[in-house]
Structures are given as C-alpha cells and as structure tokens.
Amino acid sequence: MAGRTARLVLLAGAAALASGSQGDREPVYRDCVLRCEERNCSGGALKHFRSRQPIYMSLAGWTCRDDCKYECMWVTVGLYLQEGQKVPQFHGKWPFSRFLCFQEPASAVASFLNGLASLVMLCRYRTSVPASSPMYPTCVAFAWVSLNAWFWSTVFHTRDTDLTEKMDYFCASTVILHSIYLCCVRTVGLQHPAMASAFRALLLLLLTAHVSYLSLIHFDYGYNMAANVAIGLLNAAWWLAWCLWNQRLPHVHKCVAVVLLLQGLSLLELLDFPPLFWVLDAHAIWHISTIPVHVLFFSFLEDDSLYLLKESEAKVKLD
C-alpha cells in the first residue's frame, strides 16, 4: 500500500544523486578504478579474473569493472575514515559490504522475507476463504502482484542494474495501483461492477502510459516519485475513509492499523546514515519492519472476505 510509496521516495532521491556522489567524484577513486581496469580487465588478466571469479558472481552479472569499482570504493572509504571524515556515498548509495553476490544483503534478505510473508498469507487466504467470496479474485490477484514486486525488489538489492532498477520501480508502481483498485472494488465495485471495471481500465491505461514514458522517452525520477506518492496518498486516504464509514465492523481496526503503521514506518526512510556494520541502513530497517504489516493486512483481507461471504449467503437465504 502506501509503504511502497515511501520506498519510492527514497529510491527517487537516491537515483537523483546517482549521476555523481561525493565518493565517486573523488580523484583517488577515479584513478583507482582506471588503474584497476587497465591492470585486470583486458587480455590475459581478464581471462585470469574470469577463471577465478565464483560462478554465482558471474551469474549475477558482476563484471571486472564492477569489481574494480567495489574494491576502489573501500579504498576511498578507508582514506576518508583515516582523515576523520564522514563516510561518502558512491553513485547515490552508501557503501555496503557485499556478501556472496548480494550487493545490499540486508535489504535483499528483507525483501525476500516480505515476499515470503506474502506467499504464506496467500496460501492461508486461499485455504481459509472459499472462492465464492466476492473479494476472492481481487485479493488473490493483489497477492500475486505483491509477490512479483518483492521478487524484483530482492533482485534489485542483490544486483543493481538498469534493468533491475526499472523492474523494481515499475512493479512497485503496479502494487500501488492494484492496492487502490482493491480499495475501489471493496468500497464501490461490489455494488457497481461496471464502475470497478471502468476504473480498472483507467488504471491499466495510466500504468501503460507511465511505464512507456519512463522506458521510451525519459526516465524522470522526479516525475516517477510524484506520480507514485500522489496515488499512494490517495490510496491511504481512501482506505481510512472507508474504515471510518465502516467502523462498526470488528476487523476494520486491522486495516486502520496497517495504514497508520505504514505511514509511521515511512518516517524511517527519512533517516539517512551509513550502514551499521556496512550492512544495515534505514532502508533495510524499513523493509524488515514491514514484514508483520503484510501479515496484518492479509489477515484483514481474510476476515473481510469471510464477512462478505457470510453477508452474501444471508441475502441469498432471505431471497
């Protein structure tokens, strides 16, 4: 829901700096990378590098040049620390200690755990809620969209490339749009299916235009951030308005808690500090903190779907 929006805010802010940060602008860093590439990334030296590179590193797409950048990043960080200076960023990111092929280990693991939580709750939902429940198809579709987004988040934090970055951004946008569609179906779509269908078509059109513009014309981080934040805030406000209108329902407090928790946890994204132990930064902490929120939201969807099923069955009996 709105938590994905906060994540996009951080990503957009970091990406805006990606063209040049203090660390990668340092002559010592640039000279180090240049010398490393000349020494290791051509001819026989390159063959030697490839022969000793672990298979998981090559499968993840780590090149000789990438390895040079990684090693020179730590050389530069060491010099900064020796001089008593603050740790610099490189290409818009803090320096992270690589583990195996994982570029940002904590965020990658946290993204995987978020996806695992979504998968477990999807299985529980499908076991507990009959397919005849009015919200069943929409909730199941939302779960699959979320799983796909967390998969690409895991991939992106494992290996940051242009492709994985775009897939992470686009899939996050898809989750936000599907969440607001889920809200539309729950609030007005069950009574007015045609309205929900029209809204779905509009959202698909918006997503297509959004992805096409960013992919084919210009990858504008500021526009991407503004668009997703606007939709995310509308989504949160819509859910809260529905909760206020239906506060008599015993399970509504779960939805309120989810929206408020996500808004509160989003403040973690405003923290910006070098990774603790070169692994754990504010973004990773935010990812970790959202795991129980997914469990709570799917618990709400399960309770609400069973409530709607019971209500629809009662109407059939009355008819």
Swiss-Prot record:
Disulfide bonds: none annotated. Involved in the fatty acid remodeling steps of GPI-anchor maturation where the unsaturated acyl chain at sn-2 of inositol phosphate is replaced by a saturated stearoyl chain. May catalyze the first step of the fatty acid remodeling, by removing the unsaturated acyl chain at sn-2 of inositol phosphate, generating a lyso-GPI intermediate. The fatty acid remodeling steps is critical for the integration of GPI-APs into lipid rafts. The chain crosses the membrane at residues 102-122, 136-156, 170-190, 201-221, 225-245, 258-278, 282-302. Its EC number is 3.1.1.-. Residues 24-101, 157-169, 222-224, 279-281 are lumenal. It comes from Bos taurus. GO terms for biological process: GPI anchor biosynthetic process; GPI anchor metabolic process. Keywords: Glycoprotein, Golgi apparatus, GPI-anchor biosynthesis, Hydrolase, Membrane, Signal, Transmembrane, Transmembrane helix. Its main location: Golgi. It is a multi-pass membrane protein. Glycans are attached at N40. Residues 1-23 form the signal peptide. Belongs to the PGAP3 family. Residues 123-135, 191-200, 246-257, 303-319 are cytoplasmic. It is found in: Golgi apparatus membrane. This is GPI-specific phospholipase A2-like PGAP3. GO terms for cellular component: endoplasmic reticulum membrane; Golgi membrane. GO terms for molecular function: hydrolase activity, acting on ester bonds.
